[in-house]
């Protein structure tokens, strides 16, 4: 069974998002082993110098990369990444399985983005959209797309 990890900066505080995440985690349990890890976000004042922004991204980046093994396939959610359609994402996940990738890690960075080291470690950079979304909401959206991909892959009704 495929192991999927979601590593994200920050805590989810909104109850409605936590409920949605729990629901999709439950639905996904029939298809994958899911692990979700929250990384503490680096405290920062509202106005930061460019050097301070890089320092924050570097510290968060170290924490993001800490638990990622060398064999894991890493997908970074990134505004500058490439977009998928849902069927294309499902096919991409199927291709990973065919290549023998049994562990896939998705990274959701902090509000300032991610460090260069995190970008270098990413095997793929995926953009959901050119729009900006709240990072806690991205976790729910990511889980829904993973669930949709699993259903498409199995030929089960869900995607319309």
Curated annotation (Swiss-Prot):
Pfam families: SPOUT_MTase. It comes from Desulfitobacterium hafniense (strain Y51). The gene is rlmH. Its EC number is 2.1.1.177. GO terms for molecular function: rRNA (pseudouridine-N3-)-methyltransferase activity. Specifically methylates the pseudouridine at position 1915 (m3Psi1915) in 23S rRNA. Transmembrane segments: none annotated. It comes from the Bacteria. This is Ribosomal RNA large subunit methyltransferase H. Belongs to the RNA methyltransferase RlmH family.
